[in-house]
Amino acid sequence: MDQGGLKRNCNRDDSLTFGETAVGVGSDTGDTAGSLLQPAAMHLPSPSSLPQLTVAPNGGAGTKDQGEFGGLFESPRGQCEGSEMKEGKIIRLQKRKHHLDIGMFNMEDNLSLLNQNISDLNRTSTSVISTSDTSVLGKLPLPNLFPQHIKQEGGFSLEKELGTYGGHTGGGPCDLDGNSGHLIEDTEIWQDLDLPNSLPEISDFELDSEVAHLDNILHDSSGGCGPDGSLLKETKVLVGNGGNCTDVNGTDQQHPLQHHQHQQQQHRHLLQHQQHQLHHQHQQPPSLLSSVMIKEEKDHDNSFIHIRTPGVVKQEKQENGSFCQSQCLQSSMSSLHGGGPMSSTMGAGAVPGYHYKASPSSTVGLQDQKPFGIFSNLPAVAESWTRGGRFGEPSGIQRGNDGLPSAAMSPFSVSFSSSSPRTGENSSSAVPGLSKPSGPTHKICLVCSDEASGCHYGVVTCGSCKVFFKRAVEGWRARQNTDGQHNYLCAGRNDCIIDKIRRKNCPACRFRKCLQAGMNLEARKNKKLIKMKVHRPTGSAEPISNMPVPVIPRMPQLVPTMLSVLKAIEPEIIYSGYDSTLPDTSTRLMTTLNRLGGQQVISAVKWAKSLPGFRNLHLDDQMTLLQCSWLFLMSFSLGWRSYEQCNGNMLCFAPDLVINKERMKLPFMTDQCEQMLKICNEFVRLQVSYDEYLCMKVLLLLSTVPKDGLKSQAVFDEIRMTYIKELGKAIVKREENASQNWQRFYQLTKLLDSMQEMVEGLLQICFYTFVNKTLSVEFPEMLAEIITNQIPKFKDGSVKPLLFHQK
């Protein structure tokens, strides 16, 4: 603020008006005070809290008691007197009216007026504005229309002032003009004032940092560290409400000579303050962080922008690339770390600190950088390391004992990455030796690819597969004593995917994969034996030849279930090739059926050779069984296809040959179709399942034998008993109620016995058709050979059926 502000605040008793009254008075009398004070009326308290105002006859404002008590704004410490003050007031009011649009005085327009104001200010020894409880101005907000400088009593002592911030109790706020004392008598009243341009107070810690920073700037100016070595043209430092708060646009510049003397005086007190600060450094709270922003600008040739925010220092060089030393950052870090003092001597050596060099191209779009010095000190575990220079630190500059770890001893990176977060930064990659080792690689289960928990039964597996394999093997051994088969069935083709998610879908494929991985239940016992060998005392060691050698039993092979095998070897559907566009005749239909029967016999032979245990029979026995049961197999398969596809209403010989009711009425077709429909009706009545059908078809293959017996009769009996048990398993799999299993078994075996009578009638028709050449029915070569060998045996009665029930 300019120094003439004190004059403007004197003797307002005859010109100050409030509210709407000021407008009329100012316009009638020509006094500009009314119009000037009108913008401040919006900040006044309610009219009830102020004395009632009246308009004096001379155009001034007053109260009813003005004759008794004098003016409202009369200072209790004394009146400003003299004609020079009144003339100066009139001149200033006219000048304020001329510059009312900008709200402040331009002191550069009239240098003589500035010198006159300074001389008047020096002659003034009392405060201009009353701050007592009874003063109205003490409770009014002062707008920018009343820029003022508070003149105070007493001598100035910067050391006393800094001592207050350093933790001492003593001198109150003071200005930097050489006068000290209490700024006001009642600080609570001033706190209620809403100053438009007032800035918040800063903490003790911030004051020390900014004073040290000012010392650094003075050092650059006096020592020639900057490019031109000139003084700062504009310096704006916030020192709280008790300091000299300058305006924002820099119009309140001081006289050059007075400014130079003021800087020299301030520099001397700064040196005293640093010594005083080192003595009381332990009393400064290190956790206080500044919440204000300090902006420091220089001229256009060498201008810096210094921005201080909590935990961040950002300095930008606009044109050239000279260095700027941040002493305030060092002082703040010194108190944060509790390290040794930071030297700030003014000599040939540069002040140790952090140097930031920035160009306009490199500072555009960059985020605020965080110095690594805010990290806490680490123990000096690497004192033998080579002491390296800090980033941006010129060669030859020795760093003092500032209590901060050097760049070589700090595990934090010296370079500042704008993309990294400010908190929790992990820069361990800067020092490869201190990087954290990567976590241990997890082992994978060889069965389901889950995370393995260890080596179980000789294979690295997870706990789930370990328990599954143990239960599967123990259950398989328990069932081996009864039927010798495992009950795990694969609904697919024994190639299910076993992983962490789908390992429980198919136990059969999971158990197979466990065996393929090499899991062995005896591996646990063998491991215990090996441990016993290692820990056995040497004195009781036996000769190696006498040591029992553990015998690893042969791993059990994965035996597929019988039903799964029967499903796999089931013959494919064969097409007849019948031309349905031509008219149907008995001869053409029977010829097509014989040709289809010949293809089905060939597939039946392949099917029989694929049956488990059938190849164990003698070759003659295999041929005898096929010759005696070929029509059983084809008629039973026809009944299943008709039951499955047509629900027993029609005969489905092939997908392209279905005998409906009309075709059944053809000559020589009715008798055959009636016998075949009986089989279809039995499937419908019993609701035979597919598993039951597969087992019953194998039993039909083994249901007709020669009377003299087979050459491998014992093997035949064993195979037949095996498939009878498989039929029982298929019944148990279907029926939920155990009491109905035997009843179901009885019904199915009765169906097998009834097949003997139904097929016997079909054989008679087949033999008649084959012998009677007048029908002109063609037979395939293989089927003709089978019928030729079978006819004598049936006439002689050399074959007999194997029945489950006696007639």
From Swiss-Prot:
Q: Which GO terms describe its molecular function?
A: DNA-binding transcription factor activity; nuclear glucocorticoid receptor activity; nuclear receptor activity; sequence-specific DNA binding; steroid binding; steroid hormone binding; zinc ion binding
> Under what name is this protein listed?
Glucocorticoid receptor
Q: Specify the domain of life of the species encoding this protein.
A: Eukaryota
Subunit description = Heteromultimeric cytoplasmic complex with HSP90. Upon ligand binding the complex undergoes a conformation change and moves to the nucleus, where it dissociates. Binds to DNA as a homodimer, and as heterodimer with NR3C2. Interaction with numerous other transcription factors modulates transcription activation.
Residue ranges for the region (Hinge) are 520-553
- Chain residue ranges for the region called Disordered: 1-47, 246-284, 412-438
Which biological process terms from the Gene Ontology are attached to this UniProt entry?
A: cellular response to glucocorticoid stimulus; cellular response to steroid hormone stimulus; chromatin organization; positive regulation of transcription by RNA polymerase II
Q: Name one Pfam family in it.
A: GCR
Q: What is its main location?
A: cytoplasm
Per the entry, what this protein does is: Receptor for glucocorticoids (GC). Has a dual mode of action: as a transcription factor that binds to glucocorticoid response elements (GRE), both for nuclear and mitochondrial DNA, and as a modulator of other transcription factors. Affects inflammatory responses, cellular proliferation and differentiation in target tissues. Involved in chromatin remodeling. Plays a role in rapid mRNA degradation by binding to the 5' UTR of target mRNAs and interacting with PNRC2 in a ligand-dependent manner which recruits the RNA helicase UPF1 and the mRNA-decapping enzyme DCP1A, leading to RNA decay.
The residue ranges marked as DNA-binding region are: 445-519
| One GO CC annotation | centrosome
Give the species this sequence originates from. Paralichthys olivaceus
Q: Where in the cell is it found?
A: Cytoplasm; Nucleus; Mitochondrion; Cytoplasm, Cytoskeleton, Spindle
Zinc finger feature spans (NR C4-type): 445-465, 490-514
Q: Which family does it belong to?
A: Belongs to the nuclear hormone receptor family. NR3 subfamily.
Domain NR LBD: start-end pairs: 554-788
Compositional bias segments (type: Low complexity): 412-421
